[in-house]
Swiss-Prot record:
Record's keyword annotation contains 4Fe-4S: yes
Enzyme Commission number(s) of this protein: 4.2.1.33
Biological pathway: Amino-acid biosynthesis; L-leucine biosynthesis; L-leucine from 3-methyl-2-oxobutanoate: step 2/4
Any one GO molecular function term: 3-isopropylmalate dehydratase activity
Positions contributing to [4Fe-4S] cluster binding: C351, C412, C415
HAMAP family reported for this sequence: LeuC_type1
Reactions catalysed according to its record: (2R,3S)-3-isopropylmalate = (2S)-2-isopropylmalate
Subunit structure: Heterodimer of LeuC and LeuD.
Gene3D superfamilies, sorted: Aconitase, domain 3 (3.30.499.10)
Protein name, entry field: 3-isopropylmalate dehydratase large subunit
The protein's role, per its UniProt record: Catalyzes the isomerization between 2-isopropylmalate and 3-isopropylmalate, via the formation of 2-isopropylmaleate.
Top EC class of this enzyme: lyase
Cofactor binding, note field: Binds 1 [4Fe-4S] cluster per subunit.
Length: 472
């Protein structure tokens, strides 16, 4: 019998019942909740007279709607009435149903996909869901993690189970070592550039190879975070010493003998040598440059040394039309050099790149430099109150402020136009977030996806520049 993939092992460990129609009931170990996709789920419980099946399996925090300034005012500092109501409703629901919530004034508050791992609420081998498509982030820990819809949030609250269909197995192997200045963000953008935004549809992607093994947990989280942008609901990395070291000693992590038993199990969470994948994609990590997205889809990406494509050279009429439309929306010209793209704003943050390593990388680039006078704004938004505190302990906040960047409070911020942080029409933004479709960061806003180091380099020059030139 052929060996099992990591995904096969995780699926089998959580399988409650296989059904005749091909669907299956799987057990969920952890559910993360935020203010946008949970209100109707709680209301459904209320109307049915139900209570959460396992209260301690759920953790909540507000993130999408919270302001990143004036946080001392708490909920009263939320100007938009809809945003304020959503945060108030989360507080009310968690209080009523006894669910642990890191509220707006709690230092542990932050973006849901940042706080899970930093609290040790995300542990290897778990099945993890959240009403948010970027739940794939947690797969970096050898977890079966994916986003779900609001009705499914209610289902998990009520039963701790979920009806799913098993996906196919895909291995994305990044061979060789990454060059200086090349990060996990560049790797995942290069992967999406190669396989496209539908390349992973129907698959659970395991990321492997020397380049992936060499990444920190922060780098691996960035890659798994953007699995969904490659079309895959699930992305994962096998457990190794890096994983175990990161999890050790965190508030929700096991202790004592339980820890030893857990580690013994966690070390089995890798694909067997003879496991068979339905699809295998390989990349040369040493050939990956710092990446910049130029269009309105994450697959519209190119190395910083490259140029915007020329639609006249595209033979596929559908792709050609897509390039023409993207160029028009983005206000770019065919064959325009990436380094000639001028910027209006820079955003360093989001569930993709707002962890301490991301902030250290950005700070190293801006240290001793100043934000370009041509920029309207450059902002840094830490992913949680604890990330913010650690950054301030290391003096990173002073580095950013002295360079002219705004140092904000934690939240989803400018990743999406759901709070006060937005782009104006026609503005170009170097953003460390994960999506660049039309209007994502604000009506008419033009998003360029980059790493924190590349965003920092753009902040001090006013246009895209190869960050490796600033590192020498």
């Amino acid at each position: 019998m052929a060996g099992k993939t990591l995904y096969d092992k995780l699926w089998d460990d959580h399988l409650v019942k296989q059904r005749d129609d091909g669907s299956a009931l799987i057990y969920i170990d952890r559910q993360l909740l935020h203010e946008v996709t949970s209100p109707q789920a709680f209301e459904g419980l209320r109307l049915a007279g139900r209570k959460p099946w396992r209260i301690d399996a759920n953790i909540a925090t507000p993130d999408h709607n919270v302001p990143t300034t004036d946080r001392d005012k708490g909920i009263d500092g939320i100007v938009d009435p809809v945003s304020r109501t959503q945060v108030e409703t989360l507080d009310k629901n968690c209080d009523e149903f006894g669910i642990l919530e890191f509220k707006i004034k709690d230092q542990r508050q932050g973006i849901v996909h940042v706080i899970g791992p930093e609290q040790g609420a995300t542990l290897p081998g778990m099945s993890i869901v959240c009403g948010d498509s970027h739940t794939s982030t947690h797969g970096a820990f050898g977890c079966l993690a994916h986003g779900i819809g609001t009705s499914e949030v209610e289902h998990v609250l009520a039963t701790q189970c979920l009806v799913q269909k098993k996906m196919k197995n895909m291995l994305v192997k990044v061979n060789g070592k990454l060059g200086a200045g090349v990060t996990g963000k560049d790797v995942v953008l290069a992967i999406i550039g190669k396989i496209g935004t539908a390349g992973g549809t129907g698959y659970a992607i395991e990321f492997g190879g020397e380049a992936i093994r060499g990444l920190s947990m922060e780098g691996r989280m960035t890659i798994c975070n953007m699995s969904i942008e490659a079309g895959a609901r699930v992305g994962m990395v096998a457990v190794d010493d890096t994983t175990i070291e990161y999890v050790k000693g965190r508030p929700f992590s096991p202790k004592g003998e339980t820890w030893d038993k857990a580690v013994e199990y966690w070390r089995t969470l890798h694909s067997d040598d003879d496991a068979v994948f339905d699809k295998v994609v390989e990349l040369d990590g040493s050939a990956i440059q710092p990446q910049v997205s130029w269009g309105t889809s994450p697959e519209m990406v190119v190395g910083v040394e490259g140029a915007v494509p020329d639609p006249a050279k595209e033979e596929d009429p559908i792709k050609r039309e897509g390039i023409v439309r993207a160029l028009k929306y983005m206000g770019l010209q065919p064959n325009q050099k990436i380094t000639d793209i001028k910027l209006d704003r820079v955003f360093i943050g989001s569930c993709t790149n707002s962890r301490i390593e991301d902030l250290r990388e950005a700070a190293a680039v801006v240290k001793g430099r100043k934000v370009a006078a041509s920029l309207k704004q450059a902002m840094v938004v830490p992913g949680s109150g604890l990330v913010k505190a650690q950054a301030e302990q290391e003096g990173l906040d002073k580095v950013f402020i002295e360079a002219g960047l705004e140092w904000r409070d934690p939240g989803c911020s400018m990743c999406l136009a759901m709070n006060a942080d937005k782009l104006g029409q026609g503005e170009h933004c170097a953003s460390t977030s994960n999506r660049n479709f039309e209007g994502r960061q604000g009506f008419g806003g033009r998003t360029h996806l980059v790493s924190p180091a590349m965003a920092a380099a753009a902040a001090v020059t006013g246009h895209f520049v190869d960050v490796r030139e600033l590192m020498n």
